[in-house]
């Protein structure tokens, strides 16, 4: 990438790699995995740009309380984001809190092409509220 002249590398962190159960104990190997990516980028003068959530909600949270269907998701997301900021905040300048929020909700609830695979046009327009709250909450840390 450096030989190609790239100045920035955008990648997404897998929530389940950091928190295998979606919450609870942090997976140190998951933290190390992304730290290695970040360190390699910086070593070659490439600025890491980290996407916190890219459509990969841990199945454990869906099973536990319905994932996006529950307000509990907000607290778990904030905890996940804080974990990333603490682990990588001194090395990462650019963060994307949520990847394509409008696509995630429409494919999940309007067309049922992505999880949760439900066709509910009313919820399609309500679901963006929660990721919007995430966006407004995460930068506070």
Identify the meaning behind each predicted range.
Residues 1-14, 47:
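Catalytic domains of carbohydrate-active enzymes, especially glycoside hydrolases
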Residues 10-11, 15, 30-36:
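General structural concept
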Residues 13-26:
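Glycine-rich, proline-tolerant flexible connector loops at the mouths of alpha/beta enzymes
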Residues 21-22, 35-141:
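Active-site region of glycoside hydrolase catalytic domains
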Residues 29-30, 69:
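Short alpha-helix boundary/capping motifs
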């Amino acid at each position: 990438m450096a030989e190609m002249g790239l100045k920035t590398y955008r990648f997404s962190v897998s929530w389940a790699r950091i928190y295998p159960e979606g919450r609870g104990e942090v997976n140190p190997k998951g933290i190390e995995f992304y730290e290695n990516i970040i360190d390699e980028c910086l070593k070659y003068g490439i600025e890491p740009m980290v996407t916190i959530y890219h459509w990969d909600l841990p199945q454990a949270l869906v099973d536990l309380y319905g994932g996006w269907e529950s307000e509990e998701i907000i607290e778990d997301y904030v905890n996940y984001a804080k974990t990333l900021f603490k682990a990588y905040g001194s090395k990462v300048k650019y963060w994307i809190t949520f990847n394509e929020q409008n696509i995630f909700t429409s494919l999940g609830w309007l067309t049922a092409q992505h999880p949760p695979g439900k066709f509910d046009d009313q919820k399609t327009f309500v679901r963006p509220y929660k990721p919007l709250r995430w966006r407004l909450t995460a930068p506070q840390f």
